[in-house]
Swiss-Prot record:
The gene is GTF1. Allows the formation of correctly charged Gln-tRNA(Gln) through the transamidation of misacylated Glu-tRNA(Gln) in the mitochondria. The reaction takes place in the presence of glutamine and ATP through an activated gamma-phospho-Glu-tRNA(Gln). Required for proper protein synthesis within the mitochondrion. InterPro entries: GatF. Belongs to the GatF family. Its EC number is 6.3.5.-. It comes from Zygosaccharomyces rouxii (strain ATCC 2623 / CBS 732 / NBRC 1130 / NCYC 568 / NRRL Y-229). Transmembrane segments: none annotated. This protein may be expected to contain an N-terminal transit peptide but none has been predicted. It catalyses: L-glutamyl-tRNA(Gln) + L-glutamine + ATP + H2O = L-glutaminyl-tRNA(Gln) + L-glutamate + ADP + phosphate + H(+). It is found in: Mitochondrion inner membrane. One of its GO terms (cellular component) is mitochondrial inner membrane. This is Glutamyl-tRNA(Gln) amidotransferase subunit F, mitochondrial. It is a peripheral membrane protein. GO terms for molecular function: ATP binding; glutaminyl-tRNA synthase (glutamine-hydrolyzing) activity.
Amino acid sequence: MLQTFPRVAKCVRAYSSKPTLGPKFQSLDEIKEYIFKDTISANEFLTQSERAKDRELPVPPRETVLKLLKLSGLPTKGADIERIQRNLSEQISFINILHDTDLDDSLNVKYARLLPRENATLSYGDLIVRANSGKNSELAEISGSWDSTSRASMRKDGYFIVREEFLDNRD
């Protein structure tokens, strides 16, 4: 059995828009614990009546869960099949409720995004002006502040090769 996993790291969600890397996994048990840990339940988004409908749905059979685990590359031995069956049932119920939800067709779908979609169209002249205007220091766009290929001294087939030891001691 492997003792360390040097290239596997935890991705921890700390209520921010950017994920952060946690410490490396040290054992296979840590990886299993992280993968099988419940993070969010679809029931949090359902009303009481929708949760009641959820209990009426059949639970996926054990054979189906085992096939899904094999397809996803997760271990079947030691897996909590009953918990996975409950989670799959909740997720299927949630998807069914989303499909059955009536939508208001009078709403414009382009406003259903986090960011506004009212972008002004750019002409060729606008693009040329922006390209020639240089970097905006207010947006932290400083010319020459970052060279993406500075650590790559070798090339092969038109690609730069960055050695891993150069990535460890970056400034």
